[in-house]
Amino acid sequence: MKISRQAYADMYGPTVGDRVRLGDTELWIEVEEDHTHYGDEVKFGGGKVIRDGMGQSQRCDDAVMDTVITNALILDWWGIVKADVGIQKGRIAAIGKAGNPDTQPDVTIVIGPGTEIIAGEGKILTAGGIDPHIHFICPQQVEEALMSGVTTMLGGGTGPATGTNATTCTPGPWHIGKMLQAVDSLPMNIGFLGKGNASLPEALELQIKAGVIGLKLHEDWGTTPASIDNCLTVADQYDIQVAIHTDTLNESGFVEDTLAAFKGRCIHTFHTEGAGGGHAPDIITACSKDYVLPSSTNPTRPYTVNTVDEHLDMLMVCHHLDPNIPEDVAFADSRIRRETIAAEDILHDMGVISMISSDSQAMGRVGEVICRTWQTAHKMKVQRGLLPEDQERGADNFRAKRYIAKYTINPAITHGIAHDVGSVEVGKLADLVLWSPAFFGVKPACILKGGMIAAAPMGDPNASIPTPQPVHYRPMFGAFGKAASATRLTFVSQAALDAKIGEELGLDSPLSACKGVREVRKRHMKLNDACPHLTVDPQTYEVHADGELLTCEPATELPLAQLYHLF
């Protein structure tokens, strides 16, 4: 029996050779492999395949999945693949062909009476996003981020304190303990950064043992060469990551002095372009170093006609500056440079800047990491055309893989949590996001947290079916009760795990320690490992990579924007 390619796609989703447009962007991805079998696909519904004795087996052993996502198009750094995905005990158990091995050939994912089905036909499946630059200013950020497709948040803070409004630090054992207790039942994986600004080790060691996953150096607390060296020395001893916001004013040294203080040790440089803070005007040159793991924050993603004006106002508020003080205004002006922001777009497209994050409520929007990543990819496609790696295929597969890695696997590797999260791979926590292609990158169809549906668009609860208006994002059962704690992870240091802080604080959530952090280098950043020689002209701020000028025009309109939102 034969059916048309269009009819097949309508019924089971796209297959090898089909192309899918991502939202209203100019990005197209092509299916590379299909692990389902033509004629033996499984699908749920009246008169469909997953019924007793057909696609559903009688088995109830350990091989049977708790949940199967059928016929999904997986988009991840490692490939663009059509497959069924099996989930067991909250983790991804298998990727392949689902069904009943008693009636179908080559089944690798067993469906039984105890299996729930989520229809992935015609949908794109991605890993939950990881935002590694969070100011924990308010708990409502968690819901906002979750509804956008983010399932892991790393950063620091204690609420709307003046220090937290400006810096991503949860300082001291008492605050760390209280914040660990506060997030224990939130439907989000969370890891906290302690304050790393100290010239002696003891205060940093106390914070690591109290439960942070890393330390943050911030210029507002004094990011001097001495504090950098001390913080990295302690981090090496405890195998944790250090994140840094460098010295915009160049008071304690220039970018060369900061790089010298790193001494070749790995470090996560926040908003490495510099608008979010850092040595003016040339912190962007740090991207050249193999030991620097660079990220952007989303307000400069991508460069548009509104970017510069918006940033000046944001900066005055976030860093407690006074518009009546000339020195404060000069400080703000020094950080916002059209030339380096334009170059940032291109450096992302070249795979030089490895990650994208939010800088939530502190010059960044927690719910826009994913959409701004894809807006950047779209802008670069329009302005620069296909990447060399995509020329033969004629679709944007490599570019799509490069950009999705920026908010999934690369932050996971950087912070030593890739054994648990960051990709759609067997053994990892089933933090998964389903998207309708028309809404890709901006409005998820379903968000799974640890194998349970934690959030989704839902219609009137009193309606006779799930779809009547008003449809809006609502927390689902995975976000309530003890299930919320059981399907999330709190990321800590191995020292904190050894100190049994979970028992000491009475935490319900499982704890997971970061590992293998200090060996990470830029070459480990998936599809984003380029290290060209970068220079910044101190007068014009023009950026060159290996002698080539990096510049582009600001966007006047973007996809994934007003078309999808009423306000």
Swiss-Prot record:
Protein name: Urease subunit alpha
Organismal lineage: Bacteria, Pseudomonadati, Pseudomonadota, Gammaproteobacteria, Pseudomonadales
Cofactor binding description: Binds 2 nickel ions per subunit.
NCBIfam families for this protein: PRK13206.1, PRK13207.1, urease_alph
Keyword tRNA processing belongs to the record: no
Residue sites binding Ni(2+) 1 per the record: H133, H135, K216, D359
Residue positions, PTM N6-carboxylysine: K216
Record EC number: 3.5.1.5
Post-translational modification: Carboxylation allows a single lysine to coordinate two nickel ions.
Record family assignment: Belongs to the metallo-dependent hydrolases superfamily. Urease alpha subunit family.
Catalytic activity: urea + 2 H2O + H(+) = hydrogencarbonate + 2 NH4(+)
Enzyme class, UniProt record, top EC level: hydrolase
Pfam families for this protein: Amidohydro_1 (PF01979), Urease_alpha (PF00449)
UniProt cross-references to HAMAP family, sorted A to Z: Urease_alpha
Entry binding sites for substrate: H218
Molecular function (Gene Ontology), one example: nickel cation binding
Gene3D superfamilies per UniProt: Metal-dependent hydrolases, Urease, subunit C, domain 1
Residue intervals of the Urease domain: 128-567
